[in-house]
Amino acid sequence: MSKEKFERTKPHVNVGTIGHVDHGKTTLTAAITTVLAKHYGGAARAFDQIDNAPEEKARGITINTSHVEYDTPTRHYAHVDCPGHADYVKNMITGAAQMDGAILVVAATDGPMPQTREHILLGRQIGVAYIIVFLNKCDMVDDEELLELVEMEVRELFSQYDFPGDDTPIVRGSALQALNGVAEWEEKILELANHLDTYIPEPQRAIDQPFLLPIEDVFSISGRGTVVTGRVERGIIRTGEEVEIVGIKATTKTTVTGVEMFRKLLDEGRAGENVGALLRGTKREEIERGQVLAKPGSITPHTDFESEVYVLSKEEGGRHTPFFKGYRPQFYFRTTDVTGTIELPEGVEMVMPGDNIKMTVSLIHPIAMDQGLRFAIREGGRTVGAGVVAKIIK
């Protein structure tokens, strides 16, 4: 058993606990690490080690998060747990800790609460497609019918937000009893781990996705043509392949005639690498920072979208005053700022620093985007908000 945990060949999956405050997210996180360490090897983490989560800064936003790791026989998991509700919202919107799937903790003694609903909705908006439910504190509920009612309520809530309510795995357990080593409740943690392994599909690695490179700089090299540089966000680009230049202007096609890294010519550039791509027959002035090079047909330019946004508080260096409809900040996508206007939800007149809000944005230039793309909201180069594209309108 001891050999297994050093094998890094297992698929790596990112998960996290979500749910209403005091429903037992952190206790469950501790229980998972403890029970899985006991059965499959790895390190257990005590409740208080997880609970005093260190502060992190993601894009200037202060978020408290705890990261733990654990193994099942087939996978390695990185798991994020946040102590406060605001931390969750910030985390989900900024994508500070990516989640391929989530464990929604619902106390059987309370049933779904307002934050339960908000976390499910956020999951839907930002594209956490796989959520497993852990019905916690079941040791404190004697009435089987009550458990069934709570379970039904949770399933209905999921269906309401376009999740597969009937097929969502729900585990009835007690994180505290499992943490205390009670065998029947430890079993429930193993059941949960089994759902993690089977319900959340293996995430597609960045390298297996269609090629995309956000353009950071454009150079003209005499006798050779135009070179664009940037970090490959996903996929692989090979010399001789056709690409599209997408965003800001009308989409055009060209061929990559060379890929270089550190002044050496390569056959290909891969996700995560900083490369220069030499483009055939493309003039320096036809391309600009903020556009992307992409596999033809894989991404399209858009101006109007719905988004979930977190507005930085004054303490985080954000605005000191609210903003109103008609607000025109810059929206920073990948490598560049684009001006846009906002529409607030019906009945919302103003947005205060520290709020999270759904807003519809119209940009003055189209940007290559798909659902889940993160952006910053800026005023004169200063970040005042963070957001994620929830739905493309046009």
Curated annotation (Swiss-Prot):
Q: Where is this region: G5?
A: 174-176
Protein's name according to its UniProt entry: Elongation factor Tu-B
**Principal subcellular localisation of the protein:** cytoplasm
Where are the annotated segments for G4? Answer: 136-139
Organism name? Pasteurella multocida (strain Pm70)
**UniProt-listed Enzyme Commission number(s):** 3.6.5.3
Lineage of source species: Bacteria, Pseudomonadati, Pseudomonadota, Gammaproteobacteria, Pasteurellales
Q: What does this protein do?
A: GTP hydrolase that promotes the GTP-dependent binding of aminoacyl-tRNA to the A-site of ribosomes during protein biosynthesis.
Q: Where does Mg(2+) bind?
A: T26
According to its UniProt record, where is this protein located?
Cytoplasm
Q: Name one Pfam family in it.
A: GTP_EFTU
Q: Which UniProt keywords apply?
A: Cytoplasm, Elongation factor, GTP-binding, Hydrolase, Magnesium, Metal-binding, Nucleotide-binding, Protein biosynthesis
